Regions:
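Helix-to-beta-strand junctions that scaffold the AdoMet/dcAdoMet cofactor pocket
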Residues: 17, 75-76, 88-89
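A short acidic, Gly/Pro-enriched loop at the edge of an enzyme's catalytic core
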Residues: 56-66
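A short, conserved alpha-helix within the catalytic core of class I
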Residues: 74-84
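Conserved Class I S-adenosyl-L-methionine
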Residues: 108-126
Length: 166
């Protein structure tokens, strides 16, 4: 999700092998061009890349895993979340990495987090719990802080009730 320049493609390709499929999408044609160049140079025939915003995502087959890597605006969009859940199989793994505000005891540093992220995020004021719109649709939800509390890693599985919002 929001594959950018395709930096994660090599690791994803190693995980799924030649028989698996990788779908990547990004709404930035420049970023996607770099991802395409990376996949083409490596000869990965099982990597398909789509230029579209998450809110209009449509894939040829359901997916069994979703990776959201620093995609704050997608996590803040109910329509984007609905589209992601609609293309996911029941029980699909969802892994998320992102930025959030520091814990209260480091609150003065949140101005720095805000200033660092406001140019990249449409809703930087919503960095307290950026996962709060997708988490209710996931089971086995786990979250761990990173970067002294400024970042997070999260994991869950798509609930059966979350599917079917096409």
């Amino acid at each position: 999700v929001g594959c950018g320049t395709g930096l994660s493609l090599a690791l994803l390709r190693a995980a799924v092998g030649e028989q698996g499929r990788i779908y990547g999408f990004d709404q930035s044609p420049d970023m996607l061009a770099q991802a395409r160049q990376r996949a083409d140079a490596a000869g990965w025939r099982n990597v398909e890349l789509f230029e579209c915003p998450a809110q209009s995502l449509s894939l040829p087959t359901p997916v069994d895993a979703i990776l959201l890597h620093y995609t704050h605006d997608i996590l803040r969009s109910p329509l984007a979340i609905d589209r992601l859940l609609a293309v996911a199989e029941h029980g699909a793994a969802v892994a998320i990495a992102g930025v959030k505000y520091f814990p209260r005891w480091l609150a003065p540093l949140n101005l720095w987090v805000y200033l660092k992220n406001h140019g990249y995020n449409g809703s930087p004021g919503e960095l307290t719990a950026p996962w709060d719109r997708i988490a209710p649709h996931l089971s086995d939800w786990q979250i761990a802080p990173t970067q002294f509390g400024m970042g997070y890693l999260a994991f869950g599985r798509v609930n059966k009730s979350a599917r079917g919002k096409k």
